[in-house]
């Protein structure tokens, strides 16, 4: 069975397996320990439980191993049977462990836009200078009140669909004010502008900030006149762009490449890239956990805000 104590001694192998370095993995496991204890106790004390506390089979995996199992699944999207071979467990047991652990993982991470599962309390050591941990869009806007540029984009992920094809690849609206990601899942064939409206991102942006987008966001300036909207110029029907307009589009693309890099970081976790084969009601949960992992890496590897 994979042993955490051995893998953390090989930083490159650990980062290749789960996307975190040993320090980030250890801190996250320590943060998850009390969350798992509380969730397990709540389950034991639930109404209708007949067996006494302590009875029954004990869990085979502790919190660090359960975290490693979940992160490997998010990173590589391996079949449950293969994960069962790696951790010497039945595939059904692997599935139960992962799906029970995902909500706690999202709660422990700086994940976006799912306020009902986020713990946004600011906790700092007694001997340290108080610091702000950026977990929500409001935290980012409060810490960076001078934010001037917001870049929005969309991405898709294929998933199963019924025979009548009422739905298909889910499109995600991705906003990037500093290092915070925001998501809104929709059905197949939905235009980028409609996704942006459904995400409810625009009313929450700082007044006077600039909004950057691709040609799919042409017309956003009519929705938010208090913002400066910058999108590439579209070629007129039957016409051509002038050299000045082509150069302007090139400069806009150099700014917009930032959000493309963010999408690339998200898609390194195969659960957000490959064919989605889980319950559609958990789609946002998976994306929230992955976005939280990307945020965690970004925050921990950037200067802290005092």
Where are these regions (language model features)?
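Short, flexible segments with low predicted structural confidence
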Residues: 1, 40, 54-56, 65-66, ...
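Short, well-ordered secondary-structure "scaffold" segments embedded in the functional core
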Residues: 80-306
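Charged, often Cys/His-bearing segments associated with DNA-binding zinc-finger transcription factors
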Residues: 1-61, 302-303
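Short, amphipathic alpha-helical "recognition" segments used to contact nucleic acids or chromatin
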Residues: 62-77
């Amino acid at each position: 069975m994979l042993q955490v104590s051995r893998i953390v001694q090989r930083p490159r192998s650990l980062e290749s397996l789960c996307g975190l370095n040993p320090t980030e993995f250890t801190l996250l496991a320590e943060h998850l320990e009390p969350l798992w204890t509380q969730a397990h106790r709540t389950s034991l004390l639930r109404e209708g439980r007949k067996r006494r506390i302590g009875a029954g089979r004990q869990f085979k995996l502790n919190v660090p191993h359960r975290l490693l199992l979940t992160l490997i699944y998010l990173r590589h999207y391996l079949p449950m049977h293969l994960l069962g071979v790696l951790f010497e467990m039945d595939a059904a047991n692997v599935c139960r462990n992962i799906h029970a652990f995902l909500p706690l993982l999202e709660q422990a991470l700086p994940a976006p836009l799912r306020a009902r599962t986020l713990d946004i309390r600011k906790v700092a050591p007694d001997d340290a200078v108080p610091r702000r941990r950026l977990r929500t869009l409001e935290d980012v806007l409060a810490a960076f009140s001078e934010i001037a540029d917001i870049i929005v984009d969309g991405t898709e992920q294929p998933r199963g669909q019924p025979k009548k094809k009422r739905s298909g690849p889910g499109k995600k609206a991705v906003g990037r004010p500093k290092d915070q990601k925001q998501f809104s899942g929709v059905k197949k064939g939905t235009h980028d502008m409609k996704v942006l409206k459904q995400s409810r991102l625009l009313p929450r942006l700082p007044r006077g900030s600039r909004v950057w987008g691709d040609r799919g966001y042409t017309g956003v300036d009519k929705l938010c006149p208090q913002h400066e909207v910058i999108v590439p110029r579209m070629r007129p029907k039957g016409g051509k762009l002038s050299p000045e307009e082509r150069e302007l589009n090139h400069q806009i693309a150099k700014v917009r490449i930032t959000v493309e890099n963010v999408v690339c970081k998200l898609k390194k976790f195969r659960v957000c890239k490959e064919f989605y084969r889980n319950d559609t009601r958990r789609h946002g949960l998976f994306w929230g956990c992955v976005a939280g992992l990307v945020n965690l890496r970004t925050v921990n590897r950037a200067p802290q805000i005092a």
